[in-house]
């Protein structure tokens, strides 16, 4: 399953549309005013289905993930010198990025790819392509991309 994650050009807060391969909107992400990033994910019927919320006052960035109101885990940036690395405590996944922070791989505990993330270059807004190998993992993979993008925006 392929998703295209596109930040809206004119928006006061973080706001994204997520499209499937047919160009249909499958998710909408709306940022809220808060300390740190707080991103709410809505399905195509405008039902809130998930949240990514930044923990504040941590040494390295951490984001909590919720499905509905249920806490499912945390994504934490790990200290690394040359390429970004993130740990996910909910399902044993791990994220490795390249030096330029354009491409990422999400792998499970067995070293198998769960999803790949690629940033499209030469776009006015942040645009990512997410290739998810199991469609059931699409929402969780989207949450991880949101956390990575929010962490990058905080540094820039």
Predicted regions, residues:
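Intrinsically disordered, low-complexity proline/glycine-rich segments
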Residues: 1-156
């Amino acid at each position: 399953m392929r998703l295209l994650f596109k930040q809206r050009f004119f928006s006061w807060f973080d706001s994204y549309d997520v499209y499937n391969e047919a160009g249909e909107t499958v998710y909408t992400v709306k940022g809220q005013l808060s300390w740190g990033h707080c991103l709410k994910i809505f399905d195509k019927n405008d039902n809130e289905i998930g949240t990514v919320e930044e923990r504040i006052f941590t040494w390295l960035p951490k984001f909590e993930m919720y499905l509905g109101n249920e806490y499912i885990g945390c994504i934490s940036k790990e200290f690394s010198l040359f390429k970004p690395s993130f740990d996910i405590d909910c399902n044993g996944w791990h994220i490795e990025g390249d030096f330029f922070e354009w491409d990422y791989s999400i792998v499970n505990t067995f070293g198998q790819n769960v999803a790949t993330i690629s940033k499209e270059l030469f776009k006015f807004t942040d645009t990512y392509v997410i290739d998810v190998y199991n469609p059931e993992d699409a929402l969780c993979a989207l949450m991880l991309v949101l956390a990575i993008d929010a962490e990058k925006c905080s540094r820039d």
